[in-house]
C-alpha cells in the first residue's frame, strides 16, 4: 500500500444526568465542571456498564470537539459511535465543552492578519484553559470513577485538536497553563485529527512531549498541514511541521495526500484500529516507535496544497 515507514476546576454543581444506552451497554453521565460568567461548561462521561463495578483503574480519552472556535458540540452525533467504540475497548471517554470565543466576534475585527492572529490566539488560550479545567475535574474524580489519572489521553478534532495539542505544548514548555494542573502532570498521549499548535516563532520544546498520533491531509485549507505564519511571528504550525521537529520521538503520523479537512473526522470511523494500535503500543505499552503512514489515491494526481495565510483566513471566516 503506497509508501509506508516504520513514524479539568472543581465541580460547580452536583448535577449529574445519567443516560444508559442499553443497545450499546454504554452508561453516559453528564457533569457541570465549571461556570464561567455566562458559560456553563459540561462534560459527558461514557463507560461500559459492565465495567462500572470493576476494580481496575481504566485509561481515559478526553475529547474536544471541532468547530473553528465558533461553534461545535461535545455531543455531536457524528462522534458518538467513536466514543462507544473506545468505551467498548475499555476506555472511559470524556467529551468536554470549552468556550468558543470566536462565535460572537464581528468578522470585520479580524479580517486582517494582525486582527485574525490576535483573536485566534485568545480563542485558543481560552479553549486550552477550559480543557485543563476538564482535566483537573477528571483527576479529582479519579477514585470515584475508577480511572487512572496517569493514563489520560488528550484527543480532539480540528479546533479541538488544536486545543489538545496546544495543551501538551504548554505543558512541555512549563507555561502558566502547566501550573493549573497537578505538579509533574502530563497527558499519556495525544490524538489529533487535523490539528496544529500556536506559537510565536518556531515552536520550541523544553521537554519531550508524550506520544502523539497526528492525522492530517496535505490539501487541508482550514488547518495548515505545515504552517501558516503571520510575518514570521505568530503562526499555526501543523502536523507536518510538528512531525519533522519530533521525528525521533514516539509519534504515529498519518498523512493523506490530496485530502483536505475531512481528516478532522474521518479517522474516527475509518482508522479506529490504527488508533487502538497507537494506544496499546505507544501509550499504554510505552513502545519507542516512530510510525509514518502515507495514504495515496492514484486517482488524485493534481491538487492545491500551497495555501497562504490569507487562504486560511478566508476559509475560517465562512
Model-assigned labels for residue ranges:
Residues 56-68:
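Short beta-strand element of the alpha/beta-hydrolase
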Residues 113-144:
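Alpha/beta-hydrolase active-site loop
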Residues 136-208:
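Primarily recognizes the serine-hydrolase "nucleophile elbow" in alpha/beta-hydrolase
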Residues 247-318:
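C-terminal catalytic histidine-bearing segment of alpha/beta-hydrolase fold enzymes
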Residues 73-96, 103-105, 240:
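Short amphipathic alpha-helix adjacent to the substrate-entry channel of hydrolases
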Residues 23-56:
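N-terminal cap/lid segment of alpha/beta-hydrolase-fold proteins
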Residues 68-71, 93, 137:
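Serine-hydrolase catalytic-loop signature spanning alpha/beta hydrolases and amidase-signature enzymes
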Residues 178-249:
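The feature captures the conserved acid-bearing segment of alpha/beta-hydrolase catalytic domains
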Amino acid at each position: 500500500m503506497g509508501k509506508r515507514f516504520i513514524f479539568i476546576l472543581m465541580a460547580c454543581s452536583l448535577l449529574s444526568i445519567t443516560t444508559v444506552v442499553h443497545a450499546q451497554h454504554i452508561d453516559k453521565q453528564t457533569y457541570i465542571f465549571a461556570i464561567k460568567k455566562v458559560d456553563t461548561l459540561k462534560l459527558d462521561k461514557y463507560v461500559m456498564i459492565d465495567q462500572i463495578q470493576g476494580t481496575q483503574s481504566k485509561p481515559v480519552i478526553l475529547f474536544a470537539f471541532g468547530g473553528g472556535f465558533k461553534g461545535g458540540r461535545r455531543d455531536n452525533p457524528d462522534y458518538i459511535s467513536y466514543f462507544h467504540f473506545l468505551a467498548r475497548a475499555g476506555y472511559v471517554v470524556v467529551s468536554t465543552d470549552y468556550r468558543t470565543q470566536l462565535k460572537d466576534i464581528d468578522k470585520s475585527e479580524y479580517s486582517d492578519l494582525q486582527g485574525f492572529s490576535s483573536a485566534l490566539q485568545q480563542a485558543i488560550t481560552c479553549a486550552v484553559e477550559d480543557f485543563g479545567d476538564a482535566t483537573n475535574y477528571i483527576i479529582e474524580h479519579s477514585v470515584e470513577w475508577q480511572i487512572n489519572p496517569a493514563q489520560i489521553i488528550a484527543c480532539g478534532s480540528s479546533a479541538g485538536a488544536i486545543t489538545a495539542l496546544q495543551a501538551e505544548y504548554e505543558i512541555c514548555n512549563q507555561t502558566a497553563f502547566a501550573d493549573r494542573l497537578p505538579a509533574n502532570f502530563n497527558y499519556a498521549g495525544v490524538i489529533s485529527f487535523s490539528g496544529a499548535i500556536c506559537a510565536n516563532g518556531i515552536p520550541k520544546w523544553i521537554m519531550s512531549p508524550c506520544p502523539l498520533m497526528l492525522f492530517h491531509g496535505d490539501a487541508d485549507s482550514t488547518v495548515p498541514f505545515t504552517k501558516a505564519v503571520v510575518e514570521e511571528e505568530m503562526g499555526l504550525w501543523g502536523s507536518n511541521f510538528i512531525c519533522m521537529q519530533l521525528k525521533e520521538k514516539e509519534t504515529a503520523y498519518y498523512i493523506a495526500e490530496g485530502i483536505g479537512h475531512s481528516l478532522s473526522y474521518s479517522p474516527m470511523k475509518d482508522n479506529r484500529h490504527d488508533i487502538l494500535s497507537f494506544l496499546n503500543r505507544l501509550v499504554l505499552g510505552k513502545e519507542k516507535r516512530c510510525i509514518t503512514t502515507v495514504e495515496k489515491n492514484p486517482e488524485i494526481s493534481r491538487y492545491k496544497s500551497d495555501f497562504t495565510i490569507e487562504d486560511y483566513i478566508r476559509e475560517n471566516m465562512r
